[in-house]
Structure formats: structure tokens, C-alpha cells
């Protein structure tokens, strides 16, 4: 791996931090490599969901967004699974990925498009109705979809009359002493200089090769900041990764370009502020940001019923967070964790805490040498072998230590 950083909390206080390796890599000129540091920022993937959940819950506290109401009331158009036209899709179901919405090949649309392009048969983004599960009723099945959080971004814009990224910076990040951003072009020059990249080991043809040099997969700007208010679409298909100006974007029509469920660039230090907020039950350094009930709602998976009204097993996914139950340490302890993790463009990041305690941790790793689909990279328990290795090591360090 190019670099890795961790921060550990015990009883609500930081007890350990370490940062090793490089945040940027220049294979041709290694003297230009930049070190991995506490304040180095990375695109943290699904960890971003925690902050979008913070935002949605804060809007609910202010009476601007009801999480159990039909989201069509906030989106400005009807959003129904065609197989269940009489069943509402709610904000809560967007947050916990039980909406029955599905990702297609493209999850981030250009600014000139609207999210309606995903749902209109005449649109090239409709993909023959791929954005709806055909045999699942809303609220009954979990499947992760970036589209859920893209629509939450739209709702945030329509209810606040501010751009998604700007509202989150002014009303969430500022309260936590965070200078993170979804738009690398809008960092100050000083903060942009701290931006790290995600790397993959691929050959010149783009094939995975663990003996090849590190290749930039995301945010490999090589020190050159993009033009202000511009953003590259965060789709895995390179043909759909063009860079666009945000200046003419229409508020409340397409927040997918920010990737509200994946596109946040934030440092380990700043993630530790979010962990402090969660461990403090909604307070950060003496200031109340969210309610205690908000934090409880985030960690609580839904209790679900089938079509006959019979209770089925609860999902592990709450609002922007999910549970990892029964994680084993080297000494045989069984640890229950809750949080979120990202694994995208070579970057692995996570923010977790131990249920029922004020212990938690953060990690960021910025490169992988083999394909995520390689059997060596897949974990039967976590789905991600790197996540398993990192979390098991941290869990043993935090909770097996005498």
C-alpha cells in the first residue's frame, strides 16, 4: 500500500494515532512523493454517507424533512417502484438502502441532466428500468445503491435552497471544525496541497498487475488544482468521467454529481471530529450539533416484516451506518461495531465504534495492488479482505490490550 493512517479512541478520548507511507506517489520522480499525515485528505467513499445522514437528521430536527414521509413530496416528482405503485418510498429507506432503488452503469450525471433521467424510459440513463428492483417491496430488502444518496442530495438542496456541498459545509462541517469538501477545485490552495490520491497497480493497458507501478485512480492531480467550481463525474466507466463546471447547475435537480454517498474528501483528523460527535451522543466539544435520538437512529437497523406482516430478521444497516456483529479479536473476544466503510478507487476508509462504549477508530489506506474482485481481496465476513485485516488488527489492539 502507498500509505495508511489510523486514530484510536478509548472512553471518548484519543489514545493512539499513526500515519505511515505516502499520500501521493510519483513513480518517475519519487522525490516528489508527499507523506501520509493526519491532515491529508482523501475521497473516503461510503464513509461520506455518515455526513449526509447527519445533514438529513438535522433537517428533520428543524422540521424541514420528515424521514417517514413520501420522498416524492420533497423531490418534486413521484418516486414509486412500478411493481408497487401504491407503496411510498421514504427518506428513511433512502438512508438505509431499503428503497428498492438500484444503481445502473452510471451513478453520477452531468450538471445539465436531472435525476429524472434515471426514471424516464426515453432517457439513455433509464437502462431498461434497471433502477428499480422488480420483486422487492420498499422497506423490506437491503441493497446498497449510490442512487439513494444522490436523491437525498436533491432533497437537501430543495429543502434548504442551497447547493448540497455548500449547505453541508456551512451547517455540518463548520460545527465540527472541518474544512472537507466534495469539490477538490474549491479547496483553498493550502487545503488542496494536503489532498491525497487513490492508487491501483495496473499496467499501461489498464490491467491489474501487482508488480506494476502505482497508477492514480482518483484525485491524482499532480499538484495542479482544477478550475474553481468544476468537478469530475465519479463514475467507474472512464467514458463517463468528464469534468464539468458547476456554475450553471440547477438547484435541486441533480446532486448526483457530488456523490453524496461517496465523494467527500476529508482527513483522518477531521473524521476524528465526527467520531467525537458520535461518541458524545450528538455533542462536539461542548456544543450540541445533533440530538441523542439522531445518533441512536443512525445505529439502529430497521425491524422488518414480510408481505404477510410477519417479522423477519432485522437488517444491519441503519441511517448512514451499519453494524458488524461479533467481530473476533486474537484473544477470542466478540466485538460488536457500528459505523461505515468505503472501498473505492483504491482507497479504503472506515469510521467505527464499539456498541455500548465510547471506544472507536478511524483508518484510511490509499492503494491496493490487486483487483477488488480477486479472491485474495474478498472476505467472507466483510466482503473486503483489507477491511477485515485492518479492523481485526485495530480491534485486537484496542480491546485485547491489558
Describe each PLM feature range.
Residues 1-42, 131:
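Short, conserved catalytic-motif segment at the N-terminal edge
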Residues 5-8, 16, 43, 93-96, ...:
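Structural recognition of the beta-strand scaffold that forms the well-ordered cores
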Residues 6, 12, 43-71, 149-157, ...:
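Active-site SXXK
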Residues 42, 140, 262, 349-350:
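Beta-propeller and closely related beta-sheet repeat lectin domains
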Residues 280, 299-308, 312, 326, ...:
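Short, gly/Ser/Thr-rich active-site loops of penicillin-recognizing serine hydrolases
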Residues 337-340, 348-375:
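Short, well-ordered beta-strand elements
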Amino acid at each position: 500500500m502507498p500509505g495508511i493512517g489510523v486514530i484510536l479512541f478509548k472512553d471518548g478520548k484519543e489514545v493512539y494515532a499513526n500515519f505511515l507511507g505516502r499520500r501521493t506517489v510519483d513513480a518517475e520522480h519519487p522525490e516528489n512523493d508527499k507523506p501520509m499525515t493526519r491532515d491529508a485528505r482523501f475521497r473516503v467513499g461510503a464513509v461520506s454517507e455518515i455526513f449526509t445522514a447527519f445533514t438529513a437528521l438535522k433537517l428533520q430536527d428543524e422540521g424541514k424533512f420528515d424521514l417517514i414521509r413520501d420522498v416524492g413530496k420533497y423531490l418534486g416528482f413521484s418516486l414509486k417502484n412500478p411493481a408497487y405503485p401504491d407503496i411510498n418510498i421514504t427518506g428513511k429507506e433512502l438512508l438505509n438502502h431499503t428503497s428498492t432503488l438500484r444503481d445502473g452503469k452510471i451513478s453520477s450525471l452531468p450538471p445539465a441532466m436531472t435525476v429524472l433521467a434515471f426514471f424516464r424510459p426515453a432517457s439513455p440513463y433509464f437502462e431498461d428500468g434497471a433502477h428499480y428492483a422488480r420483486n422487492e417491496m420498499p422497506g423490506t430488502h437491503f441493497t446498497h445503491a449510490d442512487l439513494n444518496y444522490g436523491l437525498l442530495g436533491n432533497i437537501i438542496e430543495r429543502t434548504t435552497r442551497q447547493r448540497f456541498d455548500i449547505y453541508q459545509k456551512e451547517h455540518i462541517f463548520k460545527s465540527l471544525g472541518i474544512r472537507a469538501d466534495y469539490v477538490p477545485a474549491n479547496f483553498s490552495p493550502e487545503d488542496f496541497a494536503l489532498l491525497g490520491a487513490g492508487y491501483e497497480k495496473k499496467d499501461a493497458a489498464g490491467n491489474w498487475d501487482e508488480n506494476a507501478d502505482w497508477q492514480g485512480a482518483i484525485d491524482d492531480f499532480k499538484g495542479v488544482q482544477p478550475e474553481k467550481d468544476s468537478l469530475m463525474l465519479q463514475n467507474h466507466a472512464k467514458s463517463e468521467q468528464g469534468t464539468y463546471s458547476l456554475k450553471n447547475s440547477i438547484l435541486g435537480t441533480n446532486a448526483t454529481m457530488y456523490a453524496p454517498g461517496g465523494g467527500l474528501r476529508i482527513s483522518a483528523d477531521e473524521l476524528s471530529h465526527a467520531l467525537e460527535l458520535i461518541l458524545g451522543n450528538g455533542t462536539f466539544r461542548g456544543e450540541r450539533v445533533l440530538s441523542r435520538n439522531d445518533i441512536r437512529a443512525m445505529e439502529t437497523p430497521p425491524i422488518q416484516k414480510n408481505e404477510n406482516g410477519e417479522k423477519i430478521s432485522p437488517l444491519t444497516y441503519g441511517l448512514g451506518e451499519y453494524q458488524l456483529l461479533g467481530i473476533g479479536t486474537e484473544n477470542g473476544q466478540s466485538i460488536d461495531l457500528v459505523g461505515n466503510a468505503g472501498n473505492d478507487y483504491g482507497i479504503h476508509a472506515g469510521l467505527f465504534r464499539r456498541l455500548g462504549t465510547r471506544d472507536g477508530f478511524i483508518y484510511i489506506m490509499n492503494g491496493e495492488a490487486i483487483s477488488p474482485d480477486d479472491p485474495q481481496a474478498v472476505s467472507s465476513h466483510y466482503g473486503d479482505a483489507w477491511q477485515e485485516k485492518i479492523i481485526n488488527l485495530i480491534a485486537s489492539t484496542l480491546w485485547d490490550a491489558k
